[in-house]
């Protein structure tokens, strides 16, 4: 774990996957457990804030930027300029300012990790709209409960298999939901049948099954007894952060 003082109001903490494993935490686990998030954040703050300049401040805020190697945690006692500070600290010299798709997914993860106030509607089962522009054209289908769909639930032996699938699996007319149940990850694929042919759906599922198994459990059971970590655009979100 590395700590850098960005300015008098902000600390950046780089936490690698090894550090997370030692604490028994994975990035995606944080998305579904608000109490675990808060406990984790304050444990990091206690370690790095040896002068107690932040711990004694009621206005302290946190923001997380997950990546494949772990995550960056920004701790600030002045949230007004936090976004600008993070942008300057993380933007490479050749990085374009045109990062709409990154902002879309970052906002999604920020809402899930920080439970910030937004006008977005949360239903207790995940966010109500897509986090990336990749799925914006599916909004009419997602909003219509009568839309004909075909669903498959996949179970992964390890999270890395899910990451590998997300990198190459880009079907048209698909929504994807990620669940965690009994320490296993499950992915629900929801195909909109008027967006894909039966043959195409069959081929897409065959590709997915190279990385996973068909699960003998329904999405309804996962929703009731497990955790829904990502809604509608799980594949896009994983693809973005685990490159």
From Swiss-Prot:
InterPro entries: MecA_C_sf, Neg-reg_MecA. One of its GO terms (molecular function) is protein-macromolecule adaptor activity. Pfam families: MecA (PF05389). Residues 119-140 are annotated as: Disordered. Gene3D superfamilies: 3.30.70.1950. Belongs to the MecA family. Enables the recognition and targeting of unfolded and aggregated proteins to the ClpC protease or to other proteins involved in proteolysis. PANTHER family: ADAPTER PROTEIN MECA (PTHR39161), ADAPTER PROTEIN MECA 1 (PTHR39161:SF1). The N-terminal domain probably binds unfolded/aggregated proteins; the C-terminal domain interacts with ClpC. Homodimer. This is Adapter protein MecA.
